[in-house]
């Protein structure tokens, strides 16, 4: 997917009359240029997938990357960097820094060489990064409050099954895991009993 996307990274031109009030004899030109150094901060729950989804587009766009894997995923991050190296990515294009976020986090997100930050993690840390960084573009995927919504006409057996699967699959360590259930009062007690039966 990332390699295919790379084939379409080209400039564009937009006729001036595409915008109200602009003249036909003018055009807008869009060029795509590398940002420079992308800091990719990956979470623990999908240490390869989410790191690769940050690294690949950055490289395809001509940037170099500093990968900061989660402490619990440091070995995965180091091995992933090795895979890119063995695939022919030149030395220095992907760099990996490991350590606890509380020890090195503030330093790396405020480093003067970082031109863009791509972070996946908690809302709390995302807010901290946002406060610490000044004029550095940010792309963040932060923790959610994912809800299952159950209405009065729902199939309660199916709803209970999906709630349990949504909450407990992958040990609940997914950003999209069900974290709360919003259910109408008329079926709440029955739903609770069905969920309890599935998890006991």
Predicted segments, located by residue:
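Periplasmic-binding protein-like
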Residues: 56, 115-120
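Short coil/turn connectors at secondary-structure junctions
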Residues: 26, 32-37, 61-63, 90-92, ...
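A structured beta-alpha segment of the ubiquitous adenosine-cofactor-binding alpha/beta core
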Residues: 27-28, 95-115
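PLP-dependent aminotransferase-like
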Residues: 51-105
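Beta-loop-alpha module in the N-terminal Rossmann-like domain of NAD(P)-dependent dehydrogenases
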Residues: 38, 45, 102-107, 121-128, ...
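General beta-strand structural signal in soluble alpha/beta enzymes
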Residues: 67, 96-98, 119-121, 138-142
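N-terminal Rossmann NAD(P)-binding subdomain characteristic of aldehyde/semialdehyde dehydrogenases
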Residues: 1-51, 55, 89, 94
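ALDH superfamily catalytic-core signature
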Residues: 116, 124-200
């Amino acid at each position: 997917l990332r390699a295919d996307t790379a084939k379409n990274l080209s400039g564009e031109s937009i006729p001036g009359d595409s915008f109200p009030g602009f003249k036909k004899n003018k055009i807008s030109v869009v060029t795509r240029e590398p940002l420079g150094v992308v800091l990719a901060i990956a979470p623990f729950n999908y240490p390869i997938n989410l790191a690769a989804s940050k690294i690949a587009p950055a490289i395809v766009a001509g940037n170099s990357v500093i990968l900061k894997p989660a402490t619990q995923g440091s070995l995965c991050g180091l091995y992933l960097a090795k895979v890119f190296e063995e695939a022919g990515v030149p030395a220095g294009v992907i760099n990996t820094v490991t350590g606890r976020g509380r020890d090195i986090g503030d330093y790396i997100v405020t480093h003067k060489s970082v031109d863009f930050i791509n972070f996946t993690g908690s809302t709390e840390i995302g807010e901290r990064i946002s406060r610490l960084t000044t004029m550095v573009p940010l792309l963040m995927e932060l923790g959610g409050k994912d809800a299952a919504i159950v209405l009065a006409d729902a199939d309660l057996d199916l709803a209970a099954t999906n709630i349990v699967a949504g909450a407990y699959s992958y040990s609940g360590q997914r950003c999209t895991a069900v974290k709360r259930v919003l259910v109408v009062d008329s079926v709440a007690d029955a739903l609770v009993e069905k969920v309890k039966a599935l998890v006991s």
